[in-house]
């Protein structure tokens, strides 16, 4: 037979059969080899399944037949055609002519081979013939790739109505208005193609699934009754289309099948913007252009879904856009989201085998709405429920902490016992006896705890099984009602269902008092997941954290000396935020710190970051002296489109997007260009900022601190004159109004004037500054002690009211660190010694002694 008579799919199967024969050392190419490789072909395997055959059984039977064939070792690899296969090829040629085919397709070859082999797993010839006819839907093979068009919808699509019948979808709650609008558009005479447009995660695909469920239930107008919704997979259409025209052929097959159904099939294309440009090569049309004629005539019913941004791809092609009717899908409110979560809760309970409490659903909707701002409801709330349930399920299926502790203790004692067995002295033997007794007690306790845990695990497994049965019975009841099988529906509803519900309730009640199996997802679990996602502490305050917050001032006083008013004001803002009383639409707090250089403005910001995040580096620090020119505003929020660096994002916006809970320090704000303050107005008032790429960045969980040296000479002068704090603040505010616009100052929560440091303050700062040196010396096991005289002298030498505490650092470096370095290098001070520093006779003296 002429090899050119075979389609590509048939030729691939025959080549694979030759390879299979050579691998098995068979000299004859038989019908078993070809039939075995043909079962891996899409068209042939689908026809076989459709006819009632069993693919796995057929493959196993053919493998057994091939194993029985004679093997020839060391031959030249020459293959001979088996007479039975030759007959099958002749028959296939005849069948192709009868069907009006120009080439022998894979399904024709399967029919011919079925006549030669009647093994297990294969259907009878009549059923197979019927299946091939049904699959072809009247199409003939006119070229080598024509099979791409056979049963195109089943190959490249998913039947949503069938999935709805099988109970695969979660219930669609709400969205009645959008589903009604989609049905209204589908019933139009022409341009009956709705496209669902909305942000990612608002439930566009769910609307198509909801419509499929309504069609299955019969809850649709007469014009849509018994219609079929098929979801088209653009990826499957494109995958493997190697040659020009192959993609178009597949798509043409889909379009023809939908058009031929005369409105009975509705196509659903998720991410519909992908049809613009899909499959386009030089000189060939894209998918969008191929769909246009059928869409315009109303022959092709199509539902699309895409996001607002990606719909622009379709808007570029006005001729395609006019064929669609947009249906805008808005994000549901928090209340609607809670209703949606209540509707789908059952499915997640069955999947994870846990109980999801109602407060957890409310927490998922409210917390995701407040803290996860870059995604949409209900998607982000569903994700929270899913992850919290998965976390609890993982804990349920892992070994409990109590068993872990006992197992580790047992292992430790066993190692100790083995070591003591080698010792012969009396003490070791007594200790060995003691360990043996401990091990016996521990093993008994471990076995008892383990048996209790195993019993609870058994109950958890039983509950999962019952829940799955309950879910299956509910699906069967729905099906029986749809089919008007009222007897079956009554048997299930009044026979099996109540018994299963009672079993589930009994097991749930029993597991509520379980020692290890904690089955409930609570609002604390949801809060813990939100904290892990965003880094924002939203979980309930622990006792230790309450104490820490109430004594926040004392902690900050340990780092920042002499600034009581500033510390109290900032501490109150943090307490309000953690108690949940701050305005949810503004940052946690915004402060402007004014005062002379070196009095602790930046240090207080670092101390706050350390308190909140356990690291003084965990803050976003923006040095405003870098933003003195007008064009540098773009560096904060990101360059606009068309400029270099557009993709990179802004220094401020990107930092906050990655870490939404942060202390943001704008250092030396008076040095920035006035336009920078216009950017900050939105942040201070609404807690939001739009970056260069149009994304909204959420600042509602940030603490904003701005530092400035404005009025520093005035503060020093007035403090030396002995003026009170209010008079000083009033004078500084007058100077501040000359520098900043009222709308900017008005948005700041509190403007705090830092006091100039006194000589007494500096004595306290000496200890803080020496702390770093002590830590560095501790690495060499050197202990440093300073007498009060030495500290007083350092404070005196380092005191300069105009420069604050910064000269003190230089003083310590000059009078303590430099001489110390010389003595360490000279060998006078050894590692592990105690160093006493004193002041007398006009200089500092260093005496070292052994640590012992």
UniProtKB/Swiss-Prot annotation:
One cellular-component annotation, GO: cytoplasm
Highest taxon of source: Bacteria
UniProt-annotated stretches for the region NBD2: 545-756
Xref: InterPro entries: AAA+_ATPase, ATPase_AAA_core, Chaperonin_ClpB, Clp_ATPase_C, Clp_N_dom_sf, Clp_R_dom, ClpA/B, ClpA/B_CS1
Domain Clp R: 3-147
Location of region: C-terminal: 757-852
Region (Repeat 2): 81-147
Chain positions recorded as ATP 2 binding sites: 595-602
Gene3D superfamilies: 1.10.8.60, Clp, N-terminal domain (1.10.1780.10), P-loop containing nucleotide triphosphate hydrolases (3.40.50.300)
Ranges for region NBD1: 151-331
Gene Ontology MF term list: ATP binding; ATP hydrolysis activity
Matching PROSITE patterns: CLP_R, CLPAB_1, CLPAB_2
A GO biological process held by the record: cellular response to heat
Keyword annotations: ATP-binding, Chaperone, Coiled coil, Cytoplasm, Nucleotide-binding, Repeat, Stress response
Linker: annotated segments: 332-535
Region annotation Repeat 1: where it falls in the sequence: 6-69
Pfam families listed in its UniProt record: AAA (PF00004), AAA_2 (PF07724), AAA_lid_9 (PF17871), Clp_N (PF02861), ClpB_D2-small (PF10431)
Main location: cytoplasm
Coiled coil ranges: 382-513
Quaternary context: Homohexamer. The oligomerization is ATP-dependent.
Domain comment as written in the entry: The Clp repeat (R) domain probably functions as a substrate-discriminating domain, recruiting aggregated proteins to the ClpB hexamer and/or stabilizing bound proteins. The NBD2 domain is responsible for oligomerization, whereas the NBD1 domain stabilizes the hexamer probably in an ATP-dependent manner. The movement of the coiled-coil domain is essential for ClpB ability to rescue proteins from an aggregated state, probably by pulling apart large aggregated proteins, which are bound between the coiled-coils motifs of adjacent ClpB subunits in the functional hexamer.
Function: Part of a stress-induced multi-chaperone system, it is involved in the recovery of the cell from heat-induced damage, in cooperation with DnaK, DnaJ and GrpE. Acts before DnaK, in the processing of protein aggregates. Protein binding stimulates the ATPase activity; ATP hydrolysis unfolds the denatured protein aggregates, which probably helps expose new hydrophobic binding sites on the surface of ClpB-bound aggregates, contributing to the solubilization and refolding of denatured protein aggregates by DnaK.
Protein family membership: Belongs to the ClpA/ClpB family.
Name this polypeptide is given: Chaperone protein ClpB
Organism field: Deinococcus radiodurans (strain ATCC 13939 / DSM 20539 / JCM 16871 / CCUG 27074 / LMG 4051 / NBRC 15346 / NCIMB 9279 / VKM B-1422 / R1)
Gene name of the record: clpB
